[in-house]
Amino acid sequence: VYAVFDNHKFGDYNAYIYKSKNKGFTWQKISNNLPENTLLWRIAQDHINSNLLFLGTEFGVYFTNDGGKEWTKLNAGMPNISVRDIAIQKRENDLVLGTFGRGIYILDDYSALRTFNKIDKNSKLFSPRDSYWYKQKRILGGSKKASQGDNYFVADNPPFGVEFTYYLKDKILSKKKSREKEEKKFEKENKIIEIPDWKILESEKKEINPAIWIFIYSNNNIIRKVKADNKKGFNRINWDLSSESKSIISSKNFNKDESGYMVNPGEYSAQLLSLIHI
């Protein structure tokens, strides 16, 4: 059982959140590392992992997946505003936030947060939720509203296809970036920085930039390669349910990420890979 209180009408802006393991006979305060002077408004518990909690505060939303021992703020795309209400859409694993004066925010498929504290690897690809297979409608031969003008308002649909969530402990750096990072560290520590010889510089010049890819498989055969972002932390990328392009490789399309026909409905596997020049 969890309970959230506020006492701001008496000039007390501290965070009050309590947990009971014996149906309310005794209570334990679990505000722990929450910032000072942070009013709390709402708490919601995940329907699968009972230790995963979401906390609406006066300054954004926090989550914990260890029952309140440590709280982490959700920042990406979420402004520093008052979150007054929280709802969980169980079928889609979506987190819905009602704010004071700034509308509604939705975090699509938060299921990756259930195992966030268990990540001990340099990277991890999380299982996506099932996707819908359909052909997107093209109005007047174009996308969205085509040429119907600004008076015809339409909002963006969610990205089409399968949405992958993956985690990178650190951004993969090139040899040059790694060397420059090490040199900056030495400079701060007042250590001697050695000038790289021409072989090192030549190797850096010829190096292929590191890249992150997601390979899609069907019956152990690669049917599509999706280029992903090389960024630290949680990232998301979509596969549009298409196969690799069957076009003949030429100088015009060599660097283009062209797609082929749409794959059949079924089960597919995916693998997160990094391209590094050794």
What is each model feature region?
Residues 277-278:
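Conserved small/polar residues in nucleotide/adenosyl-binding loops
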Residues 222-259:
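Glycine-centered tight-turn motifs at strand-turn-strand junctions
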Residues 261-264:
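Surface-exposed, short loops/turns at beta-strand junctions within beta-sandwich domains
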